[in-house]
Amino acid sequence: MATIEDGTSEDRVANDEYKIWKKNTPFLYDLVMTHALEWPSLSVQWLPEIEKESSDHTVHRLILGTHTSDEQNHLLISKICMPTDEAQFDASRYDTERGEFGGFGAVNGKVEPDIRINHEGEVNRARYMPQKPTIIATKSPSADVYIFDYTKYPSVPKDNTFNPLLKLKGHTKEGYGLSWNPNKEGLILSASDDQTVCHWDINGNAGANGELKAREIFKGHESVVEDVAWHVLHDGVFGSVGDDKKLLIWDLRTNVPGHAIDAHSAEVNCLAFNPYSEFILATGSADKTVALWDLRNLRLKLHSFESHRDEIFQVQWSPHNETILASSGTDKRLHVWDLSKIGEDQTAEDAEDGPPELLFIHGGHTAKISDFSWNPNEPWVVCSVSEDNILQVWQMADNIYNDVEDETPADMVERS
């Protein structure tokens, strides 16, 4: 059992590591923006549209949620100004007044809520529909999935009324997993602590009270279902993972899984299908590893990515690079992996830093990372949020992913 002293020394270590990280940011990043949110967000996702306001910055939008103590919770559409290539960005610039660093021209990386929508309980997860990004689904501490069209709400709520477009019924407990079908508009899957996956078509006829019953309820897991994801290319295929350590592959046309794999040695918390390859997917687990799978032969794990020091809760493929994958979780780190480097020769010194496929470690958070999102418009730009209210937008230095020999002398970069 952890004592108070343990917690304090852990905080001290995290703080020391953060100081080293901050000192090294000019060498490691082309962009770093840190913002303290009013409340922690358990979820983050970039919206796909951007606005170019001037030659030196563009306006991007993020879907966030709140996790308040006892106050009203909100689903948030927030805007953030991002530098263009013409802007001069200084990753080392620190604003003591704001407690933020990173700046360029008149833009300081501030995240400003554009629209606040009342939400019942904290927002466990929020994801937009790919075919119509103004439609957002959320998971909360209730068993229901809520659907909103954010264009139908004022920028600030007039009162505390909770008024989603739809309430999707089918679960008996809360959960986190949520996935819109990338090929068929309106189809959505949800995973729950009740050991099931529910499937809805939001184009269906809802009742007068705005409630819509699940079209199918899939039962195959023997414990909590942690995550669910549609296959990116096959519109009727999806995967689910859970605390029973299993990966299940399903087809909508049948109510039993086509494949059931013992995927990890502990709970499986997340999965993601590769957007470029119809056979490749990744799973992340409490066993501290990310596993790589080939749907053509699920009996054999293709590869195990090992470098995290604690449970993994998120895994996501880059939307721009077929071989790039990122993972994050309880160890406060976000790891970026490059599949093309698996098996490359390493010096003993390099091996101490991790396997050859470990491209980058983002060490800017001092608490568990709750969620992250790859920017769909800006390659290599990531937004990550942690339990201590911190939101960071960052991009690793291009000499890291361009395989250019690092010009920073090794003795100038401190090790954490």
Curated annotation (Swiss-Prot):
GO terms for molecular function: histone binding; histone deacetylase binding. CDD domains: WD40 (cd00200). SUPFAM superfamilies: WD40 repeat-like (SSF50978). Gene3D superfamilies: YVTN repeat-like/Quinoprotein amine dehydrogenase (2.130.10.10). Keywords: Centromere, Chromatin regulator, Chromosome, Developmental protein, Nucleus, Repeat, Repressor, Transcription, Transcription regulation, WD repeat. Its main location: nucleus. WD repeats lie at residues 118-158, 170-210, 220-260, 263-303, 307-347, 364-404. One of its GO terms (cellular component) is transcription repressor complex. The keyword rRNA processing does not apply. Pfam families: CAF1C_H4-bd, WD40. It is found in: Nucleus; Chromosome, Centromere. GO terms for biological process: cell fate specification; chromatin remodeling; embryo development ending in birth or egg hatching; embryonic digestive tract morphogenesis; mitochondrial unfolded protein response; negative regulation of vulval development; nematode male tail tip morphogenesis; regulation of DNA-templated transcription. Belongs to the WD repeat RBAP46/RBAP48/MSI1 family. Binds directly to helix 1 of the histone fold of histone H4, a region that is not accessible when H4 is in chromatin. Probable component of a NuRD-like complex, composed of at least lin-53 and hda-1. Interacts with lin-35. Interacts with hda-1; the interaction is direct. Component of the DRM complex, at least composed of lin-9, lin-35, lin-37, lin-52, lin-53, lin-54- dpl-1 and efl-1. Interacts with hcp-3. This is Probable histone-binding protein lin-53. It comes from Caenorhabditis briggsae.
